[in-house]
C-alpha cells in the first residue's frame, strides 16, 4: 500500500488537482477525492496524517465528514479549507476537532509550516 502525506477533499476538481500538483512539487504525496463519502471510505481504508477538507461538498457538509474522520482516525489532523467560511463555521469546525481553518486561496507556505508542526507533534 502506498503511503500518502495527505488527502485532499474538494468538489472543485481543477482546484483539488492543482493543489495536489503544487504540493507534490514540495515532495508531498497526495491523494485526491471529490466528495465526502469517498473521503470517509478512504480514511477508513488508509492512514493519512493530514486531510485538507473543503467545507462545502455536494453530498455531505464538511463538519459531518470531519466528525466521521475524527471518529475513525482521531490522530488525523484535519485542515478545513473553504471559500465561504464564516466565524460560526470556524467555531463549529474547531469544536468538531479540526486542526485549523483556512480560507481559499490556500497559502502554500502557511500550509507547509502547519504540516511541519503536525509532523513534529506526531513524532
Regions found by a protein language model. Give the residues of each.
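Acidic, metal-coordinating helix/loop segments flanking the phosphotransfer/catalytic sites
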Residues: 32-50
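Short amphipathic alpha-helix used as the core "switch/output" element in two-component signaling
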Residues: 41, 63-74
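C-terminal output helix
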Residues: 88, 106-115
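Acidic catalytic/metal-coordinating carboxylates
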Residues: 35, 61-64
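Alpha4 helix (beta4-alpha4-beta5 surface) of REC/receiver domains from two-component response regulators
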Residues: 64, 85-100
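The short loop immediately C-terminal to the conserved phospho-acceptor aspartate in CheY-like receiver
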Residues: 55-56, 84
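Two-component/phosphorelay signaling modules centered on CheY-like receiver
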Residues: 13-31
Amino acid at each position: 500500500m502506498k503511503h500518502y502525506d495527505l488527502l485532499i477533499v474538494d468538489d472543485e476538481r481543477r482546484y483539488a488537482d492543482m493543489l495536489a500538483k503544487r504540493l507534490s512539487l514540495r515532495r508531498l504525496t497526495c491523494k485526491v477525492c471529490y466528495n465526502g463519502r469517498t473521503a470517509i471510505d478512504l480514511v477508513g481504508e488508509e492512514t493519512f496524517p493530514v486531510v485538507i477538507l473543503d467545507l462545502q461538498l455536494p453530498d455531505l457538509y464538511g463538519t459531518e465528514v470531519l466528525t466521521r474522520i475524527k471518529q475513525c482516525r482521531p490522530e488525523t489532523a484535519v485542515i478545513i479549507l473553504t471559500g465561504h467560511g464564516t466565524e460560526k463555521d470556524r467555531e463549529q469546525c474547531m469544536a468538531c476537532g479540526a486542526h485549523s481553518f483556512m480560507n481559499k486561496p490556500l497559502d502554500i507556505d502557511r500550509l507547509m509550516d502547519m504540516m511541519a508542526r503536525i509532523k513534529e507533534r506526531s513524532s
